[in-house]
């Protein structure tokens, strides 16, 4: 429930602090005093649109905050907990608007996006505006009212989810089909491009090995000649060779070491060098023996190497990248080849998803039909109480499978007959302004009782109503206030007198500036205000007596 409202520098309000209570609170005031200004300010806390013109003239910013008790609001508490914003049993929404139109939103002191403020606001307060009777003529509003009364949140969520899944898959299938012809042309091009690569069948690391072999074969003569020269220098030279010389050095060092111990380490060092030279000699000898210049092999390697280089140039890649390029083209072809198979599988999936949507929409439809009959009776009864004794009301729910939406297949129409003998027709065709106001109020009061929102606001919803009908409206709202908090802006004394509490809005001018104030009235002040509403500026004993009767009758 709304416990406190703080308004600073909003429109013509300098500063306003309101403590609010359970039950029904009525708000009255003179014409032009700004009876709805507190509701407008509260709307900012609930995520309403912000404008620079809302900032009081001469001030830098507007700041509005609303404190709510969460004792009986499990949905709001759960939402706050899920979003890591829960702080005890109270929730404070705050909004700041600067004179240049910038806006900041806060929940329990933490900055939040406006979307979160709106979402939480819907769990805290339900606002019924003075133009609701105009909305009542719109089919989408009529459908919303029925769903709200029936508590279709879960069914609507399931239907919307099924619809979105079906439409997403349908759009994917449509895109695949549109691309099919283009894919065929692309497939033919890829198959032409890949033909030579398939014939080449290059291995993953083959080019590196091929390049090394080609270089080796191309230089085989020089390799053999230089190998032979190195072998001769190492060990096979007739006049001199490295191993022979090093062996002579080794013998000499051994003799020297025997003569002087300081040279003991030198023979072993030369011995190690001898071992390495001998190993080098044997490696070269084996390598020379392996050199076998095969003209056929050389021709094969040259031809294959040339093909790799040619295809690499043709495909605009480096030779060492040709294998990966080939694999990428194969993958593209595989993807295009399976497009028909993919389309077939996706078409089957679309059918399944559509049937899921149809099942969810049908379940929602049946529930709407059931609750429409229930709501028919309640609204007709309420209209009779609101001085429309002969009126008949009916909600028509028609299912049209050709027109699907996230809300299912249903079209809802509110039908009414205001006089005996008249057929039921859409309310926009037959109802007058006053009748629309009464029907709208009846629907709002009935649906409000079904919504799990602890605070309800009725902003001049009694427009077009007077006399005994106004008294009935007041009693309906008071009864509603016994189970939930109701704030009602009204100009009717019969409605104002039914409130458990009453606030008075006054406008005054100070130092050339207009200010709006809101006062909580005691019993005597309420009688005086009700008398003013009954008789205008001239308050008489008769109007005072009537005002007292209104309070007693409530």
UniProtKB/Swiss-Prot annotation:
Molecular function as annotated in GO: ATP binding; ATP hydrolysis activity
Top-level taxon: Bacteria
Keyword DNA repair in annotation: yes
InterPro entries: DNA_recomb/repair_RecN, P-loop_NTPase, Rad50/SbcC_AAA
Record-linked SUPFAM superfamilies: P-loop containing nucleoside triphosphate hydrolases
Keywords for this protein: ATP-binding, DNA damage, DNA repair, Nucleotide-binding
Biological process, per Gene Ontology: DNA recombination; double-strand break repair; SOS response
GO CC field: bacterial nucleoid
Binding site for ATP: 29-36
Record-annotated disulphide pairs: none
Signal peptide positions (record): none
Function: May be involved in recombinational repair of damaged DNA.
PANTHER family reported for this sequence: DNA REPAIR PROTEIN RECN
NCBIfam families found in the cross-reference section: PRK10869.1, recN
Family that this chain belongs to: Belongs to the RecN family.
Name of this chain's protein: DNA repair protein RecN
Organism: Vibrio cholerae serotype O1 (strain ATCC 39315 / El Tor Inaba N16961)
Gene (name only): recN
């Amino acid at each position: 429930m709304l416990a406190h409202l703080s308004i600073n520098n909003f429109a013509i309000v300098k500063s306003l602090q309101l403590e609010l209570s359970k039950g029904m609170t009525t708000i009255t005031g003179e014409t032009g005093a700004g009876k709805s200004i507190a509701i407008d300010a509260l709307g900012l806390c609930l995520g309403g649109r912000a404008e620079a013109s809302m900032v009081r003239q001469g001030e830098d910013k507007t700041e509005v905050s609303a404190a709510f008790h969460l004792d009986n609001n499990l949905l709001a508490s759960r939402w706050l907990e899920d979003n890591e914003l829960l702080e005890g049993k109270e929730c404070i929404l705050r909004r700041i608007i600067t004179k240049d139109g910038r806006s900041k939103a806060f929940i329990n002191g933490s900055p939040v996006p406006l979307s979160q403020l709106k979402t939480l606001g819907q769990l805290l307060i339900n606002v019924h505006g003075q133009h609701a009777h105009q909305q009542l003529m719109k089919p989408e509003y009529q459908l919303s009212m029925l769903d709200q009364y029936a508590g279709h949140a879960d069914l609507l969520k399931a239907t919307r989810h099924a619809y979105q899944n079906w439409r997403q898959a349908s759009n994917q299938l449509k895109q695949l089909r549109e691309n099919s012809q283009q894919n065929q042309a692309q497939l033919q091009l890829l198959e032409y491009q890949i033909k030579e690569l398939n014939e080449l069948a290059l291995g993953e690391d083959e080019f590196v090995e091929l390049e090394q072999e080609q270089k080796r074969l191309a230089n085989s003569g020089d390799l053999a000649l230089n190998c032979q020269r190195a072998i001769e220098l190492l060990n096979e030279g007739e006049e001199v060779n490295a191993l022979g010389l090093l062996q002579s050095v080794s013998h000499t060092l051994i003799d020297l070491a025997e003569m002087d111990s300081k040279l003991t380490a030198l023979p072993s060092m030369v011995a190690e060098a001898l071992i390495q030279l001998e190993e080098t000699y044997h490696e070269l000898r084996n390598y020379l023996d392996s050199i076998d210049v095969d003209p056929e092999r050389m021709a094969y390697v040259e031809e294959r190497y040339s093909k790799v280089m040619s295809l690499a140039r043709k495909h605009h890649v480096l030779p060492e990248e040709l294998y990966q390029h080939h694999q990428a083209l194969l993958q593209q072809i595989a993807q295009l080849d399976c497009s028909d198979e993919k389309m077939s599988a996706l078409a089957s999936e679309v059918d399944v998803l559509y049937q899921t949507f149809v099942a969810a929409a049908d379940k929602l439809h049946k529930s709407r039909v059931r609750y429409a009959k229930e709501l028919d009776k309640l609204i007709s009864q309420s209209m009779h109480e609101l001085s429309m004794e002969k009126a008949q009301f009916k909600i028509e729910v028609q299912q049209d499978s050709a027109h699907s939406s996230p809300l299912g297949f249903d079209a809802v129409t509110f039908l009414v007959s205001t006089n005996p003998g008249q057929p039921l027709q859409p309310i926009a065709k037959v109802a007058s302004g006053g009748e629309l106001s009464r029907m709208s109020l009846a629907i709002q009061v009935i649906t409000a009782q079904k919504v799990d929102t602890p605070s309800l606001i009725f902003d001049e919803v009694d427009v077009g109503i007077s006399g005994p009908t106004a008294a009935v409206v007041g009693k309906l709202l008071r009864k509603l206030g016994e189970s939930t908090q109701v704030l009602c802006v009204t100009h009717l004394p019969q409605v104002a007198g039914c409130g458990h509490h009453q606030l008075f809005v006054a406008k005054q001018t100070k130092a050339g500036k207009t200010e709006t104030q809101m006062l909580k009235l005691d019993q005597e002040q309420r009688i005086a205000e009700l008398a003013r509403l009954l008789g205008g500026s001239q308050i008489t004993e008769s109007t005072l007596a009537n005002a007292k009767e209104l309070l007693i009758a409530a």
